[in-house]
Structures are given as C-alpha cells and as structure tokens.
Amino acid sequence: MQETTVKRDGASPSDAGTPATTAQGLGKLYIRTFGCQMNEYDSDKMADVLRADQGLELTDNPEDADVILFNTCSVREKAQEKVFSDLGRVQHLKKQNPNLVIGVGGCVASQEGEAIVKRAPYVDVVFGPQTLHRLPDLIKRRRAQGVSQVDISFPEIEKFDALPPPRVDGATAFVSIMEGCSKYCSFCVVPYTRGEEVSRPFDDVLLEVADLADQGVKEVTLLGQNVNAYRGAMGDSGEIADFAMLLEYVHEIPGIERIRYTTSHPKEMTQRMVDAYARLPKLVSFLHLPVQAGSDRVLAAMKRGYTALEFKSVVRRLRAARPSLTLSSDFIVGFPGETEEDFQKTMKLIEDVGFDTSFSFVYSRRPGTPAADLHDDTPQDVKLRRLQQLQALINQQAAAIAQGMIGTRQRVLVEGPSRRDPNELMGRTENNRIVNFPGVPRLIGHMVDVVVTHAHTNSLRGRVAGIERDTSGAE
C-alpha cells in the first residue's frame, strides 16, 4: 500500500485575495493519503474544495493544522487498524486544540461509516470518495451542531460538478474520468466502497484536460477503477463515447504531449483500444494491465471474466499494434484454494508474457466479499514462499528491461530535482522508468532526449543527448 502526504506550494496569483483563515479560525490543512492514484487525485480535490471555500493552506506538519484528514484505502488487510492507529497518533492534538477538525475519508470511511466515530469519538467528519466535495458543509455542520458528521452516500458524479477548477504546479496531472467498479471480483471491496461504474460526461473531461494544458501540463493520466470501461455521455445528443474515442480527442488537445491511464481491465481491452496504440503516438508505450493469476481455475474463482489464454491474446494484439509496449500487472498469491499447480501456471504466464515492475501481494481476506467465505487451507509460509518466487521472477524480467535500455535514447519529461541529488534532475521515460541525470533547472517541465548510461534497481541514470558522456554511475 502506497502512502503519501499531500503537499502543495503557496497560492497562485489568482488566489491572492483568498484569506488564509475564516471566521471559524481555519488556516492550515494536513492530508495523509494511502493507496492508489485515485486517492492521490481525491486528496488534491479535498485540498482544492477547502482552499476555495475556507481558504485553507496545505501543511506537511499535522501539529500546525486546523484540519487533519486521512484519505484511506481498504484494499489490503488490516487497513482499518492502520486508520485507527494513525488517528491515535493525532488524538493528543485534539486535546490541545478542541477546535481542531479531524476527518476520515476514502474507502475505509465508506466501508466503516459511523463505526469510526463510535470507536474514535474525537473524529469530526467521515466521508466517502463520492462525497468529498461536501467537506466544507460537513465541517460547518460539525462546528454548528457539535455532533460528528457522517456522509458515505453515492451521489454518482455530483462531486465533479461541485469541484473548483483544477490547479497544478507541474507538468503532470491526474484526471479522474469515472468512478466505481461494476466487475465485482470476488476478492475486491471497491464496488462496495466506491459504488458501481459511473462515467463523467465526455465534454467535462475534455474541458478539464484543456484547462490543465493551459496551465502547462504536458502529461495527463486518466484515472478510473476500470478506466477502459469509460462510457461518457456526449452532450445532449444521447450518444456515448467509449474510452478509445476519449483518447482520440484528448490526443488532439494542444499542449498535451503524453497520455497515460490506469487502471485497466483485460475484459475491456477492445479492438478499438488496441488500434489506439497503432494510431495515437502520444499514448505512452506502457500499460498497467492487472491479470491477478495465471490459472483458469483461480481466475474463475476470482470472477475475473477471462482465461489465461484470453489475457495472452490481448497482450499479443497490443504488442502487434505497439511492439515497444511494456506491461506491468497485479498478482495475488495464495488465493483460497490455490494449489502448487495453480501457482506454477501463474509463473508460466509471467514467463510467457514478460512484465516490467509489478505489484504482487499475498491474498488479503476482505470482509463482505464473496471470497471471504471461501475455505483457505494453504499455510502462510507456503504463500510467502510463492510470493518470493513470483517477485524474484518479475524482478529478473524488470532488470532485463532496464539493462536493455542502456545506450538507448529516451524521451524524458523532466519532473523536477532528483530526490537523490537536488543538484540533478529527475524525469520519466515513456515506459514509466525514473531517470536521474545532470541538467539545469530550466529543463524542468520540458521534454528532453536522454541517453541511458546505467541501470539500477529502482531507477536509471543518463545524460542529456549531446552532452559529454556521464561515467559516474551514481544512482
């Protein structure tokens, strides 16, 4: 489970007249984010709505905050306990400052609801992914009534209509194009915490991307739980745009140079989607396509809706359209009833397909899902051994991809200073590899050709094309 703390620079010129505090004394906002890129996007929107309505500025120190929010993820086991552990760490701040507002959002909030307040009565607001736009009203009602507020309803796409215009500082941005999931995989809580699939109107998505491009964004990542299941209404015509059509239109927006998307589902990888990789050069040569397992028996128990052979067929068609395409994926090891033969079929699929860096986990039982009722007799040590074997194979494949990039010329979008050396720069290749290289700050936010000189475990090192060769090998 990924974990991030939302930070943002000071107000833009357009915010110059916004007061830093309100009549209620609000001033600073701290958000801690767990989980996927959808949650990162949602956290940005929480900050946007509270800045617009109450003038809150982000801080990376919870002790300075007037509002503390936890944006939670329920994909992994013990997610709820993690939330209560984090809440316990800020409880003393509530005692020091009774006016402090503490809120819990995201999928754990959606799943647990009022149970959070019962267990942690110092929590002021609980809200779901679909009701984050109501945060200002929830906080105001909490202050006016003195009672904790809980809103975990599913008002479909209402939140997108209520959100302020996007505001970004860099060359990359996320754009949520749909919410929820209607696949109901037997192991997954997402349909229960984020609702069923609802797509944003076609024009709304294009307007947001165009707005971001006007702010200097060059790369957009289109987000959805099953992003390629997008079916957006086109104005009042009654026509529906599929994901391939949306990609075609985003591709034509001036200023946008790269398009990414996540997360996709193999069942929704239509021929029109495959053809997009042959026709749309701005669509990057990288795809995250979760397969979960390589055994048809396990895939059926997971209710994934495809076989291993059908998954391989999708991959073959994609690579025929874009030979340079690299794939990452998700794998669950130790699903209830998984035998050694089932596991070896997953290993065979990995060998046959070839994956870049991927996400793999031992199965986590999620209460309320169909898989939670399945008999699980595989010892934990066996599951851990299988996970280690699977990760070793994927790491080997990822290392081979990285080694194969040495000496190649890569188009890199420079995102900022290197995390390892602030005097150097960091950017990403099309296939989502981080590259660190010497360069001047004026390159930040621009596309640069970089020659890869060294491959490391989690990054590459290179030099700007045309600059004398870098031989340091520093990571």
Curated annotation (Swiss-Prot):
EC number(s) given by UniProt: 2.8.4.3
GO molecular function, one term: N6-isopentenyladenosine methylthiotransferase activity
Co-factor(s): [4Fe-4S] cluster
Cofactor info, note text: Binds 2 [4Fe-4S] clusters. One cluster is coordinated with 3 cysteines and an exchangeable S-adenosyl-L-methionine.
PROSITE patterns named among the record's database cross-references: MTTASE_N (PS51449), MTTASE_RADICAL (PS01278), RADICAL_SAM (PS51918), TRAM (PS50926)
Residues annotated as binding [4Fe-4S] cluster 1: C36, C73, C107
Keyword Cell division attached: no
Disordered, as annotated region: 1-22
InterPro entries assigned to the protein according to its UniProt record, in alphabetical order: Elp3/MiaA/NifB-like_rSAM, Methylthiotransferase, Methylthiotransferase_CS, Methylthiotransferase_N, Methylthiotransferase_N_sf, MiaB_methiolase, rSAM, rSAM_horseshoe
Domain Radical SAM core: 167-400
Record text on subunit structure and interactions: Monomer.
NCBIfam families: miaB-methiolase, MiaB/RimO family radical SAM methylthiotransferase
Record-given protein name: tRNA-2-methylthio-N(6)-dimethylallyladenosine synthase
Species in which this protein is naturally found: Bordetella bronchiseptica (strain ATCC BAA-588 / NCTC 13252 / RB50) (Alcaligenes bronchisepticus)
